[in-house]
Structures are given as C-alpha cells and as structure tokens.
C-alpha cells in the first residue's frame, strides 16, 4: 500500500487525480510557486488569495508528503522554511496553463500576456518551467 492510497476514493484515474489536486487550495499553492515564485509560508500568507494559516500549513504538509514539493532551510537563513516544486509538482504546469486559458475564455481574462497570447502551449509550458528553475537555481 502506497502513501497515496489513503487519498483515493476509487480506482478511476480522474477521480484519483482530483482526490489529490481537486480541493480549493492545492492548485492555488502550486500556481503561487510556479508563476509568482512564492517560496515561504509568509509569502504564501501575504498573497492575494488570502489562504488561512491552518489551511496553508495543511496543504504544504500534504504536498510535501505526496512528493509535489520539498521543504528546505537555506544556508543563510536557518529559521525560515523554503518550499520548492519537485519534478512531480512541475508536471502540473500543463494543468495550470489549461485552467488559466479556460478561465481566460470563459470566466475572467488573465492579465498575464504570456497566457493571454499563447500560440503554442508546449512552448509556454517549457518556458514557465525554465523560468521557475532559473529563479530557484540561485537559492
């Protein structure tokens, strides 16, 4: 039995994926990390999304437990935890892109020009991951 088995309601792949990322806050935290380079509890707490501290703490622990993020203390700051997306977490980039595009066309236009003017989703996907990795590589 894997650690993820307790999250799943049934054997349906879509339902299983939603059991992991389908709550109100998980993809918000991933989006904050991926697109806005948020890394600390304080940065997440101060975001426009207004995530309650208890919910944020729970989501960060869950994301770490299932391998979407890792928690580290930086050499120059041993007091603050920094959170980084793993390859598994980065694999949600296409989901974030699709949700943003769907919202742009059906609910609310996005103010991110990269997303609003996307011509090639795969190219955008790779650019977002490269930007994330380049911003976190120096830490």
What does each model-found stretch correspond to?
Residues 1-10, 20-24, 46-47, 100-102, ...:
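Recognition helices and adjacent regulatory flanks at domain boundaries
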Residues 1-3, 7-8, 17-20, 32-33, ...:
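Short, contiguous, well-ordered secondary-structure segments
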Residues 12-55:
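N-terminal helix-turn-helix DNA-binding core of bacterial DNA-binding proteins
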Residues 22, 75-99:
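Basic, amphipathic "hinge/linker" alpha-helix immediately C-terminal to the N-terminal HTH DNA-binding motif
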Residues 37, 67, 103-107:
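A general structural signal marking secondary-structure boundaries and capping sites
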Residues 45-74, 78:
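Canonical helix-turn-helix DNA-binding module
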Residues 94-139:
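C-terminal regulatory/oligomerization modules of transcriptional regulators
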């Amino acid at each position: 039995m894997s650690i993820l088995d307790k999250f799943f309601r049934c054997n349906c792949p879509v339902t299983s994926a939603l059991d992991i990322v389908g709550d109100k806050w998980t993809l918000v935290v991933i989006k904050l990390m991926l697109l806005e380079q948020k890394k600390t509890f304080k940065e997440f707490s101060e975001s426009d999304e207004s995530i309650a501290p208890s919910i944020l703490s729970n989501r960060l622990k869950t994301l770490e437990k299932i391998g979407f993020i890792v928690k580290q203390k930086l050499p120059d700051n041993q007091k603050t935890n920094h959170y980084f997306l793993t390859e598994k977490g980065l694999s949600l980039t296409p989901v974030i892109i699709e949700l943003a595009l769907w919202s742009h066309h059906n609910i609310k236009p996005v103010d991110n020009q990269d997303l609003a003017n996307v011509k090639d989703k795969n190219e955008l996907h790779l650019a977002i991951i490269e930007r994330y990795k380049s911003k976190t590589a120096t830490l």
